[in-house]
Each structure stands twice: as C-alpha cells, then as structure tokens.
Amino acid sequence: MLFRSQQGAFQLRYFGAEVFVVDLVGILQLREIGVLLTAIMIAGRSGSAITAEIGSMKMREEIDALKVIGLNPVGVLVFPRLVALVIAVPCLTVIANAAALGGGLLVSWFYSGIAPETFIDRLHAGIDLSTIFAGLIKAPFMAIVIGIVASVEGMKVGGSAESLGRQVTASVVRSIFVVIVLDGLFAMFYVAIDF
C-alpha cells in the first residue's frame, strides 16, 4: 500500500489531483487488495501447514485409524480447520486493511504533504460501508477454498516424504490460483449487481 500511495500521488500530481490518492488507496485496499493479499498469505502459510499435517497423518495411517474407530476424518480433521480459517481470514483482512491504510496515510503525509486529518476526512468521504463489505464478504469464501484445497491435497499424500512435499507445493499453488480466480469472479459479480 505504501508503494501504491507513492505511485498514485506521483501520477495524480500531473493533474493537480494528489488529494484523490486517498480515494485510490482506500477503495483499492478495502475492496480488492486487502482480502486478496491476506488470502494469498494464508494459503502459503496455513494452507501448506494444513496439507502437511493431514498428509503426514495420512502417511502414518492415522486417518485409517480414525476410520477404524468410527470417526469421520472430514469431521475431525477438516471441519475444525475450515471453521478456524473462516474466522481468521476476515479478522486478518481487517488488520491488513488497517495497517495498509495507516501506511498509506504516512506515505501521503510525507511524500505528498496530505495532512493526516485531510487523509481521514477524504477516506470518510470516499469510502462507504459497501466498499468495506465488498472486501470482507469475500474473505470467508476464500478461507473455505483455501481449507478445502489444502485438505484435499493432504488426503492425496502417499506413503513417502516426496509425496508429502509434492502435495504441499501443489496445495499452495492451487490455493493461490483459485483465490485469484475467485477474486476475479467476485469482481465481475459485483459489477453485474452494481455493488
């Protein structure tokens, strides 16, 4: 967000519209970038951990043991992780948005001379609740996608460490790809419903 603020201010300076960098930063961060970058980081960090954990349990035949004692592995291993992701990703998105807007405020202040009060006033004027919710609505869906992809890849692990490494890599790549596609689909959906 720091670089977007700096580059946005640099380009808008040519038109005498530097103050509109606040609108650019606010809308872009809250609507698109905040949730997308958060989901990508979660896919890399937590998605890989979920795949590795479930995959190593599969390698040691612990999942088969769960089935033998009458427990459903999806209910015991997958569902709690999905719930945790659905709670964590929106919370982390809010934190990421706050940090990015704070960084945008600092860059706008030091680089463009936009006072913090002006930044906050412009942010209040240019951002409404629909902008905030446009990003936050995506977060649980992205969390579910990350959790499902990570769990499925973990369940595919064979009996070797090589298989585990391959599935962890596949989990991260597929999760990031699906999250980006999902973000694009949400953007098209929002345009279609004028949200």
Positions of predicted regions on the chain:
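Membrane-embedded translocation segments of transport machinery
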Residues: 14-58
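Short cytoplasmic-facing helical segments at TM-TM junctions of multi-pass membrane proteins
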Residues: 53-79, 161-164
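Start (N-cap) of specific transmembrane helices in multi-pass transporter permeases
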Residues: 73-93, 171
